Amino acid sequence: MKFLGMRLCEHDSNISYFDGENLHYFKSERYQKGGEMGKHHAYANFESWITEIKKIWNLEPNDLDEIGIVFDPWHYRLNYEDDNFFPTKKFDYLPYNITRVDHHYAHALSSWPLTETCKKHFVFDAYGDYDISWSYIEDDKLVDLGYFKMNDSLGNLMNGASIEMEIVVQSRLDSSGKFMGLQAYGNIDEEYLNKLRVFDMTMMRAAFQFTLYEQHVGDPLLARHKKLDWARTIHYWAGEALVNHFAKYVNKDDEISFSGGCAQNVVWNTFIKNEYKNLVVFPHCNDEGLSLGVLEFFRKKHNLPRYKTNNFPYWQIQR
């Protein structure tokens, strides 16, 4: 059987192809010219993959047994009010039999190159499908989730914190990573950290409010001069809050995976790893791994043997 998995929208576009024997991976930004459009390349429309697979693998859509996509309809001004689905739905916008896979489910499934046994998955990013900011998935079932409108998202709040810190970037996609680096120059305000500990992941929006720090310091001007300490403290709080959040669902000896854009944070990963020794975080934990998750969905659907992992993670095709 031949499968195609795709993530095309917004950034980190990638396509994975299983030819019945071997797996092939393509991340589009590797073949773009320099600058921000190359670095964060995404396809401008959701038909571009048809040209790409012809160019790369000499494939036509009808050559494939299964096609799957992780898709952000709001980029194309399409309706997304019914996007609270799990695990899949039919993709109706092209005249092919295409399966749309839940964004967070694809993240969870993409752990397969590093583990054959993990069944418990945490996903945190800026946005999943529609309004979903985090998910806990166990045994291929959605156990719990958070909503952006209610709680915000950890990825979005890191971006907002970078704006508060007046970090200058060419692309907002870089801002959370730069905030992660900059916060290391501050000091933890232990008294403020203790105040933040009343918040959990369901109240993350409140925890990140700089006005709380101004009230804590007692003077807005002085608080602005201590912004590095604020940054270090809320970043530390988030690491603790993630550990506490995981404890609601899993035991310390469980094998768990952590994915989504937030899993690129090495400080938070260290917090989690110190408590959960069987933590799995993979190099493609961000959106560049979504197409691999789609392929895993099809492998499981058709009860096929595990894909070969030879030469992982060096799977990018050469052309």
Report each predicted region and the residues it spans.
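Short acidic/glycine-rich loops and adjacent helix/strand connectors
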Residues: 1-319
